[in-house]
């Protein structure tokens, strides 16, 4: 199940020579309930790529979103990304589970934090 989402963060750097991962501002990690070394999916809004990596903690308040290692080939400074964390939960907990959603501005400052995803009623 979706546990955490940082919506439309801006990549601040891409470091190809680093070992690998995504560096995320500690404040964003805490708001989204992401832990160091936790596996995440990163969806690049600009080019449509989707990658799987793990989180390392960046300085609190820095706004840092940095793709590292091979992941740096999947995005560039200025690209918008959606960062998704998942968790396993019991079937019983699926009835009440709500993910942590973090919305940011162009400098990766938190603008809103909420739980749950709005449903859309699609008429056929």
Swiss-Prot record:
Keywords: Autocatalytic cleavage, Cytoplasm, Decarboxylase, Lyase, Pantothenate biosynthesis, Pyruvate, Schiff base, Zymogen
Cross-referenced Gene3D superfamilies: 2.40.40.20
Pathway this chain belongs to: Cofactor biosynthesis; (R)-pantothenate biosynthesis; beta-alanine from L-aspartate: step 1/1
S-S pairs: none
Protein's name in the database: Aspartate 1-decarboxylase
Signal peptide start and end residues: none
Species this protein is from: Dehalococcoides mccartyi (strain ATCC BAA-2266 / KCTC 15142 / 195) (Dehalococcoides ethenogenes (strain 195))
Chain positions recorded as substrate binding sites: 53, 69-71
Entry's cofactor comment: Binds 1 pyruvoyl group covalently per subunit.
Encoding gene (name): panD
Lineage of the organism: Bacteria, Bacillati, Chloroflexota, Dehalococcoidia, Dehalococcoidales
NCBIfam families: panD
Active site: 21 (schiff-base intermediate with substrate), 54 (proton donor)
Function text: Catalyzes the pyruvoyl-dependent decarboxylation of aspartate to produce beta-alanine.
Family recorded in the similarity comment: Belongs to the PanD family.
Assembly behavior: Heterooctamer of four alpha and four beta subunits.
């Amino acid at each position: 199940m979706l546990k955490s989402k940082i919506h439309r963060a801006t990549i601040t750097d891409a470091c190809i020579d680093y070992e690998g991962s995504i560096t995320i501002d500690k404040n964003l990690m805490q708001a989204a309930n992401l832990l160091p070394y936790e596996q995440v999916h990163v969806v690049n809004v600009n080019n449509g790529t989707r990658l799987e990596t793990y989180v390392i903690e960046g300085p609190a308040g820095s706004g840092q979103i940095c793709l590292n290692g091979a992941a740096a080939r999947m995005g560039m400074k200025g690209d918008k990304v959606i960062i998704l964390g998942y968790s396993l939960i019991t079937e019983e907990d699926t009835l009440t589970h709500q993910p942590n959603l973090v919305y940011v501005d162009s400098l990766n400052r938190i603008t809103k934090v909420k739980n749950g995803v709005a449903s859309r009623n699609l008429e056929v």
